[in-house]
Amino acid sequence: MAAFQKIKVANPIVEMDGDEMTRVIWKSIKDKLILPFLELDIKYYDLGLPYRDETDDKVTIESAEATLKYNVAIKCATITPDEARVKEFGLKSMWKSPNGTIRNILNGTVFREPILCKNIPRLVPGWTKAICIGRHAFGDQYRATDTVIKGAGKLKLVFVPEGQGEETEFEVFNFTGEGGVSLAMYNTDESIRSFAEASMATALEKKWPLYLSTKNTILKKYDGRFKDIFQEVYEASWKSKFEAAGIWYEHRLIDDMVAYALKSEGGYVWACKNYDGDVQSDFLAQGFGSLGLMTSVLVCPDGKTIEAEAAHGTVTRHFRVHQKGGETSTNSIASIFAWTRGLAHRAKLDDNAKLLDFTEKLEAACIGVVEAGKMTKDLALILHGSKLSREHYLNTEEFIDAVAAELSARLSA
């Protein structure tokens, strides 16, 4: 076969390297599936824990700022250190979650979506199409002030306006017994508006209907605000575009939406408040079969900046085997899709049809290989259960090699 004419990519992408087993497969993906085919300017940031520690986590902030500059980032899974990791790596500090830091700088909404393979059975067999879930990653319980109340007394909520104006006081509860618990949480109009814009942009790009779920019957003002802002944003900027694409936006009660989700066939974008999104994204991942088949894209309110990553962790258990020189069978599909989703966005921004075609062929190669029966151990286990034996699966590198061979065949077809 003649040497492949590399596809030129006009603008750079930001690459964020990561940790452990995912760092190992990341390099392999880059060397075998990306660099042989693309002429690409990569702005590289090492978000591996040792370098984050060395730079006092500045590298994480720099990588997020570069993302705002270049509009496309592709991220490998990273360790968020706990006490044990601080000891293991001899860290200067227990650094925060890089994903949290990046999310706060980009002010984005996280969208998760499963990768479907016909031969991998789903726990919810009715889900024949993907469901893309968007989680509002700001405020509510995650930025709340919660406290234990000891003894009797009044709990009040007070708002003191800046400058002129009267302060407002609400009596929340009168504790008469031995006390209890309390919680005060908030969100901002700006953040809800950004969430609405990102959700609508994602739905339009996919040409899928959009549902927002809240409990506005109980939280009439709090959740009512989400409902109202979404409706305003929809009417102002998206309604005509949605109608032209034959899709729609609808608000649903969270309990109705969960029931609908379970009996639906899929094929829509589900916008969730922070806590609901935290819970329901794991419900979807399990229902579709595997976190190893879950993509995650952070979409910014500017409509042009995204960061793509795998929805899973750094696969420490496999890395320990790899460190000892043992054979691993780690699923690289979600990490490959981080590259394809990021590059597909680059292609759309640059109007690069060849690059877009390449990303579609790489995704099809991954799915094609699995559907032809070549897969890693985690997927083979879903298929074969207790009857699983070594001939049913490929090891980490064999799988990436199989995808590379399939990709080359599709590109030369």
Swiss-Prot record:
It is found in: Cytoplasm. Binds 1 Mg(2+) or Mn(2+) ion per subunit. It catalyses: D-threo-isocitrate + NADP(+) = 2-oxoglutarate + CO2 + NADPH. Mn(2+) binds at residues 255, 278, 282. Its cofactor is Mg(2+); Mn(2+). One of its GO terms (biological process) is glyoxylate cycle. Its EC number is 1.1.1.42. Keywords: Cytoplasm, Glyoxylate bypass, Magnesium, Manganese, Metal-binding, NADP, Oxidoreductase, Tricarboxylic acid cycle. It comes from the Eukaryota. Its main location: cytoplasm. GO terms for cellular component: mitochondrion. The record marks 142, 215 as: Critical for catalysis. GO terms for molecular function: isocitrate dehydrogenase (NADP+) activity; magnesium ion binding; NAD binding. Substrate binds at residues 80, 97-103, 112, 135, 215. The keyword Metal-binding applies. Leaves, nodules and roots with the relative amount of 1:3.4:7.7. NCBIfam families: nadp_idh_euk, PRK08299.1. Heterodimer. May supply 2-oxoglutarate for amino acid biosynthesis and ammonia assimilation via the glutamine synthetase/glutamate synthase (GS/GOGAT) pathway. This is Isocitrate dehydrogenase [NADP]. The lineage of its organism: Eukaryota, Viridiplantae, Streptophyta, Embryophyta, Tracheophyta.
